[in-house]
Amino acid sequence: MDKNTHIDTATRDAIEAAAFRHLLQHLRQRTDVQNIDLMGWGGFCRNCLSDWVAEAATARGVALDREAARQWVYGMRYDDYKSRHQTPATPEQMARMDASVARNKAVRGEG
């Protein structure tokens, strides 16, 4: 953010929040993109975003359980999303996701 150091914290937070809302909208529209592929290639998925939303809420004293956070991210109940849009994972997808989870742990210094 070297070139943008003149942006105050409140404005930066508003910009980041708007970008996050746009990401959620995009993911809700792209139901063809499976969570396992997001996780395998990008190291995160809609469930990760849900966990991060719940963690951020808790850090600010807001009670938000896992199901509510998932509904926030998915735009519908998680079970409804899975039944409408989730397809069975292939062995290749599972292997890629497992490797990505291991990479996440290594990057965070957990393994």
Regions found by a protein language model. Name each.
Residues 2-111:
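Domain-level signature for proteins that mediate thiol-based redox and metal-cofactor handling
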